[in-house]
Regions:
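Acidic-leg catalytic submotif of subtilisin-like serine proteases
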Residues: 20, 36-38
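Short, structured beta-strand/loop micro-motifs enriched in basic residues and often containing a Trp
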Residues: 50-60
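Right-handed beta-helix
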Residues: 17, 65-72, 78-220
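Short aromatic-glycine-enriched beta-strand elements
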Residues: 27-35
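Alpha-helix capping and helix-loop boundary segments enriched in small/acidic/polar residues
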Residues: 7, 59-63
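A short macromolecule-binding patch
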Residues: 41-51
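Short boundary/loop segments of OB/S1/cold-shock single-stranded nucleic-acid-binding domains
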Residues: 1-19
């Protein structure tokens, strides 16, 4: 691509820091407005431009959309060195902003954390890998390798867990409601520790009970 004709103005090659000033592109092009503090901020020297945001996946009505926060620091480069054509290559922590997780030598943690403290975390610890999705309220989904299980937990303590033994445990604080036109249970034995109550019971074979009064056709 031929460089823009701009009267032979200065060219800026390499990468430069910039500060985000606006993320709502009125032209609908998905650009982000940035300011270049290193060019000065006095009067006419407050230089700003709408920058194209680079993404690992961008296509028509699809892609990865994660916009930087206003006032956050980003790293930009300029097409053919033209100050009017900036591209945001990524964001940067700069000392005033801190990482969402303190680094460790083992480098096992990968994390995506939002402003409201919602987190998607990958733990690559050898022998006990884990993926977790959590919210500040306490809701969480955890996939673990050690023990190999999956847990879905509500902030109020209700839990759905798929265990290493192959069982599924559901713990509800109040009730467990199932609504469907038909519910089919296929099992050699179904065990209930308390009272089983129903409006109509139809059996195809026998009812074994210390106290039972059958109706016509073995309908209760």
């Amino acid at each position: 691509m031929a460089p823009p004709v701009d009267g032979g103005g200065a060219r800026y090659f390499g990468v430069y820091p910039a500060l985000v000033t606006d993320i709502v592109d009125q032209d609908g092009l998905g650009r982000v407005q940035v300011r270049f503090p290193w060019l000065g901020t006095d009067g006419d020297r407050d230089v700003r431009a709408w920058a194209t945001l680079c993404s690992p996946y961008a296509d028509d009505q699809q892609g990865l959309e994660i916009l930087p926060e206003v006032d956050s620091q980003v790293v930009v480069a300029f097409e053919a060195g033209d100050l009017r054509r900036p591209y945001i290559l990524g964001a940067a922590w700069n000392g005033t902003t801190t990482l969402p997780h303190s680094p460790e030598a083992a480098n096992n943690i990968r994390i995506l954390r939002s402003r409201s403290d919602s987190r998607l975390e990958f733990d690559d610890t050898a022998g006990s890998a884990k993926v977790s999705l959590t919210m500040a309220s306490g809701h969480q989904i955890i996939l673990e390798d050690a023990p190999p299980q999956i847990t879905i937990q509500h902030a109020n303590g209700c839990v759905l867990r798929m265990t290493p033994a192959g069982s599924i445990e559901i713990n509800a604080n109040v009730s467990l409601d199932v609504t469907a036109p038909t519910v089919n249970v296929t099992a050699p034995v179904s065990t209930f520790s308390g009272i089983v109550q129903c409006s109509t019971l139809i059996t195809d074979a026998f009812v074994v009970s210390p106290a039972y009064t059958p109706g016509v056709g073995n309908i209760w």
